[in-house]
Amino acid sequence: MEKLKIVGGNKLSGSISCSGAKNAALPMLAATILSDQPITFKNLPYLQDITTMFEILGSMGADITLNENMDFRISTSKLHDFEARYELVKTMRASILVLGSLVARYGFARIALPGGCAIGTRPVDFHLEALQQLGAKIELKNGYIEASAKKLTGCEINFSGISVTGTENIMMAAVLAEGQTILRNVAKEPEVEDLADFLNSMGAKVTGAGTDEIIIDGVKELHGTVFSIPADRIEAGTYLIAAAVTGGDITISNVQASRMNNILDKLKLSGCLINIEENDIQLTMDQDCILPVDISTAPFPGFPTDMQAQFTVLNALSKGSSVVTENVFENRFMHVQELNRMGCDITVKGSNAFIKGVDFLNGAPVMATDLRASASLILAGLCAKGETIVDRIYHIDRGYERIEEKLSYLGADITRLPN
């Protein structure tokens, strides 16, 4: 199993370009099922989760090619198998996203109950209840979801809880349904807006994404499109914190700062100097002046749960005490035990992490437990004294494109160790 070796102490400096957003790309890849015409993606990140979605689509009969411009072209005109098998789904919970598209276009889907991140309960009930309201018949058989419908019919759906993938799945199902669908209590994440933009570029009629209510007027068919994946706000936030914990000065290009206000506001409170110009964000930080900032995660526009672990590291190096509260997922403090081995002073009680800032961290062998926990351990290693070995880095490859290359370019001493 590959590992990352980090020798801490180098201040990061320089400029990097932000990769395309995984959380925007995955539902769009699932939505290619909705059209029999080819779709071309630009700025698609090279990540393990993207590869997994390619494997799922490929197993159904999709044709996926890469052109000379490094753009991916996907054609789902010859799908012959409407099943997402367990051996693929178990590695990525977002596999459930193909459910809505398959039922809408082909009237049937057989999807293994999802696996993926080990960070608590992420129920698929919201997806299934909403699909039933659109007219689908749902059965659970031997660990699989079987959904079928002769034709989906638009209706009003009030989600019983906010779910990003639930919102996205039903958006995809509703674009080919008869009549109008109104979704309420929906996720407002920028990636939901991105999916709406993508679907509309294919000829769908989706309005209201990013607000409390999404309205979808069903159409008979969708056409092909060429679409560029927006920048990954979580990747950008992670690199900004990498600069902050090392007392560095970096610029991230190809990123929309307006999508990151919830992150940037907290970084400013921690003492970071941030300058925004068009699609660039520059961060400068004095490592000796990190201020503690309380964090409470919430659905967008609140502070993103996917940045909680990274900000925990920043708080752990602050001049004071802070509290990080996780309101979105249970069991998402598994990184704390490993961080404490490096010298952090963090106590977890329920959904709260109580943090007392320390002057420095020490390198140590640590083990990653999930994607964002992996990122937090790398951040800790960058600013720690001595050598840190991060094990089980397959987690990091699910969501960060060439992370060791980008960090090395900024001046980090980081090396990928082979199996």
List each language-model region with its residue ranges:
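Short, structured segments at the rim of ligand-binding sites
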Residues: 1-419
